[in-house]
Swiss-Prot record:
InterPro entries membership: ESRP, Nucleotide-bd_a/b_plait_sf, RBD_domain_sf, RNaseH-like_sf, RNaseH_sf, RRM_dom
Alphabetic keyword roster: Methylation, mRNA processing, mRNA splicing, Nucleus, Phosphoprotein, Repeat, RNA-binding
Presence of the UniProt keyword Cell wall biogenesis/degradation in the record: no
Cell location: Nucleus
Protein name in the entry: Epithelial splicing regulatory protein 1
Positions of post-translational Omega-N-methylarginine modification: 578
Length: 677
């Protein structure tokens, strides 16, 4: 609770575009600013003032011209925004004769005039707003406090407030803007008089700057306060995001840049605001611009934010405990680099905060350095000096430098500290069989489609290939998804022969599918496997995924001991057990395998996946085929799981991995089941 100001300055802004509830949502510039002073102590209203503002783009919508009676000729000689704000400040100071102890505060019809017009536009034009624009009274909220029985805030405007107070409709001033300011002055006088006696004591606040900070994974976050911003420039920082959302209050540490599977920024960020109201205002900035790029803004959840920004490391929390620091990320450090060498690298012109204490090296779980580090600088000047050393040499390696954020520190540390190394399992009794339909071979009997529409389905691909669709192997369509599970625009098709793959590539290369031309290349199953696991395939050849697990493990000859897991089988089934082949990869049934780095792109239902944990083609012969019968079940309940299927076949010998539940294109279970007995 703060003291009530002596004066209120009623403020109203008009842009070259939308009005009312859509004000500011179209990113149009301010063209007219109107204001009037209300003396709360003496209950008097001053004169109406207005100033035209010349926008950079002299283009007005037809609705704006009709509402305001302003055209481009009127604006051509008007002052620009910074000059108009100086006129406003000077006029208010002269009228109030501001001295020691005199206070005033802005009052607007809703949040849009200050948060969605003045602050964003001033930020884009590098105009410094006066102090008075960082606090204001929302007349709608104050009226709701004064008259609880009035309509809801989303339905409350100047006309509704005047109607609730039984004011006569003002037809003397029909010009848009002036009539609203006149009515707002009268509404304020009515609110501070009998019988309401309302006090304006708790204004809205606009944050001066974004505050960085940490977020715990156990923190409770309101899911209605988070948005996802997409299309950011790769070099953007959390300060750039805060500037894009200028006027809206972002929670401390609430700007989290997202990283892709390779640890690089993917152009997305999750932003957490202080309230749902600010989140809703942020959604109105959908497709507003950051420089020359438009930014998409969508709703997100608290869980999404915690996945990116949440962390539990005490080391990170201690590193980020120093507030108001600029973070710089170093990449490509020699693995033997020390803190003293990093301090010497930046030198005296950009001293690191706290010396060696301001450096955080990133390591793998076993303590090996990754070549990444984060460094703290006390001010923007030091950080800019540091960034000028981008690609300077440290030892014999050039070092990449980027502005970073607290959330990026959490993500990088979480990624490297939580990725488990591949465990060396003990010799098991159950073999993991490779997929028989995707042998890693150099026979070029596959085709790759690149540039597919993101909405393309398997049926669209079959239609695109026309006569060659009959030459596709069973389950031979593999759609490549990105790390977020969305289509990447690539697909691999397994053909029945190399000739058909060659002819399909020749005939359909650069043919169109849904107004997009599609590139078609002939390739091998091995190349397909590399891409499905996160590698890249281009004109320069294959670039393997970040970490491939070894193709096989070799175990020593097992002793003649029956494992404890075999106790579930009948004794007759354990006679003459088959000897294990030491050259083949075997894993226990419950063993969980990990890649050192998550870069696997899953295929949709119906397109089987191929991982590098299995033996190569040369090792396939070492696993003798196991006889069995496939049983198809129909009429299953939609929520039936593998456990229920195995219970149904209790008493028969089968492996748990022999159950295959079918799913449709929307990844929902369909009532079919295949079991190998």
């Amino acid at each position: 609770m703060t003291a009530s100001p002596d004066y209120l300055v009623v403020l109203f802004g008009i842009t070259a575009g939308a009005t009312g509830a859509k004000l500011g949502s179209d990113e149009k510039e301010l063209i007219l600013l109107l204001w009037k002073v209300v003396d709360l102590a003496n209950k008097k209203v001053g004169q109406l003032h207005e100033v035209l503002v010349r926008p950079d783009q002299l283009e007005l919508t037809e609705d704006c011209k009709e509402e305001t009676k302003i055209d481009a000729e009127n604006l051509s000689s008007a002052p620009q925004l910074d000059q108009a704000l100086r006129q406003f400040n000077q006029s208010v100071s002269n009228e109030l004769n501001i001295g020691v102890g005199t206070s005033f505060c802005l009052c607007t019809d809703g949040q849009l005039h200050v948060r969605q017009i003045l602050h964003p536009e001033a930020s884009k034009k590098n105009v410094l707003l006066p102090e008075c624009f960082y606090s204001f009274f929302d007349l709608r909220k104050e009226f709701k406090k004064c008259c609880p029985g009035s309509p809801d805030l989303d339905k409350l405007d100047v006309a509704a407030m005047a109607e609730s107070l039984n004011f006569e409709k003002n037809d003397s001033m029909s010009r848009y803007g002036a009539s609203q300011v006149e009515d707002m002055g009268n509404i304020i006088l009515a609110m501070i008089s009998e019988p309401y006696n309302h006090r304006f004591s708790d204004p809205e606040r606009v944050n001066y700057k974004f505050e960085s900070g940490t977020c715990s994974k156990t923190e409770l976050i309101d899911g209605n306060t988070v948005v996802r911003a997409r299309g950011l420039p790769w070099q953007s920082s959390d300060q750039d995001i805060a500037r894009f959302f200028k006027g809206l209050n972002i929670a401390k540490g609430g700007a989290a840049l997202c990283l892709n599977a390779q640890g690089r920024r993917n152009g997305e960020a999750l932003v957490r605001f202080v309230s749902e109201e600010h989140r809703d205002l942020a959604l109105q900035r959908h497709k507003h611009h950051m420089g020359t790029r438009y930014i998409e803004v969508y709703k997100a959840t608290g869980e999404d934010f915690l996945k990116i920004a949440g962390g539990t490391s005490n080391e990170v929390a201690q590193f980020l405990s120093k507030e108001n620091q600029v973070i710089v990320r170093m990449r490509g450090l020699p693995f033997t680099a020390t803190a003293e060498e990093v301090v010497a690298f930046f030198g005296q012109h950009c001293p690191i905060t706290g010396g060696k204490e301001g450096i955080l090296f990133v390591t793998y779980p076993d303590g090996r350095p990754t070549g990444d580090a984060f460094v703290l600088f006390a001010c923007e000047e030091y950080a800019q000096n540091a960034l000028r050393k981008h690609k300077d040499l440290l030892g014999k390696r050039y070092i990449e430098l980027f502005r970073s954020t607290a959330a990026e520190v959490q993500q990088v540390l979480n990624r490297f500290s939580s990725a488990p190394l591949i465990p060396l399992p003990t010799a098991p009794i159950i073999p993991v069989l490779p997929q028989q339909f995707v042998p890693p071979t150099n026979v070029r009997d596959c085709v790759r489609l690149r540039g597919l529409p993101y909405a393309a389905t398997i049926e669209d691909i079959l239609d695109f290939l026309g006569e060659f669709s009959t030459d596709i192997r069973t389950h031979g369509v593999h759609m490549v998804l990105n790390h977020q599970g969305r289509p990447s625009g690539d697909a691999f098709i397994q053909m029945k022969s190399t000739d058909r793959a060659f002819m399909a590539a020749q005939k359909y290369h650069k043919k169109t599918m849904k107004d997009r031309y599609v590139e078609v290349f002939q390739c091998s199953a091995e190349e397909m496997n590399f891409v499905l696991m996160g590698g890249t395939l281009n004109r320069n050849g294959l670039s393997p995924p970040p970490c491939l697990s070894p193709p096989s493990y070799t175990f020593p000859a097992p002793a003649a001991v029956i494992p404890t897991e075999a106790a579930i089988y009948q004794p007759s089934l354990l006679l003459n057990p088959r000897a294990l082949q030491p050259s083949t990869a075997y894993y226990p049934a419950g063993t969980q395998l990990f890649m050192n780095y998550t870069a696997y792109y899953p295929s949709p239902p119906g397109s089987p996946n191929s991982l590098g944990y299995f033996p190569t083609a040369a090792n396939l012969s070492s696993v003798p085929p196991q006889p069995g019968t496939v049983v198809r079940m129909q009429g299953l309940a939609y929520n039936t799981g593998v456990k229920e299927i195995l219970n149904f076949f209790q008493g028969y010998q089968y492996a748990t991995e022999d159950g295959l539940v079918h799913a449709n294109d929307q990844a929902r279970t369909v009532p079919k089941e295949w079991v190998c007995i």
